[in-house]
């Protein structure tokens, strides 16, 4: 399945997975790499992935995710984390652009000043972490479908317990879990509200 529009139309949330359909570390790595191609504000790449690939790690995650069976039946689960200090990525991102001649050092310093100024607001940092990490999450799900895998975005888990259980730095905020695997049966397409109800033309 390589046509982008076909992939978008075919993607649906799957909660029942084939337990005999593993995903290799190489395949999973490729999907994560594709997810990192998602856009982000100032290209700060506000995401971090915690990958639950082994049966043992998924079993440990299970009670944190309220014992949802897809956690252990899927081939892997990826926790999408948002970076509350993504502004600290700015120097690395823009130093490379400056060294390649795409921006001047003056422009680099101006951009870093704007970024660090915005990050004085904790609310801005949190909103940006959720917004931009979610873009990577969606890209991961689309990439997985394009590669023949199914997914489900999971918001129902104990985020505080997750942070403690897996020793997640306070720099990161848990955004969602994404289960990945092969559907044991075709997912049914969920209904959508009419476009006229969810859009306004001006």
Curated annotation (Swiss-Prot):
Subcellular location: Cytoplasm
Highest taxon, organism lineage: Bacteria
GO molecular function: oxidoreductase activity
Main localisation: cytoplasm
One of the record's GO cellular component terms: cytoplasm
Induction: Repressed by YodB. Strongly induced by stress due to exposure to catechol and less strongly induced after diamide or 2-methylhydroquinone (2-MHQ) stress. Not induced by oxidative stress due to hydrogen peroxide or methylglyoxal.
EC number per UniProt: 1.-.-.-
One Pfam match: Nitroreductase
Biological-process GO terms, alphabetical: catabolic process; response to toxic substance
Keywords, comma-separated and alphabetical: Aromatic hydrocarbons catabolism, Cytoplasm, Detoxification, Flavoprotein, FMN, NAD, NADP, Oxidoreductase
Cofactor(s) needed for function: FMN
Function, in words: Putative nitroreductase that may contribute to the degradation of aromatic compounds.
UniProt name for this protein: Putative NAD(P)H nitroreductase YodC
Originating organism: Bacillus subtilis (strain 168)
Chain's gene name: yodC
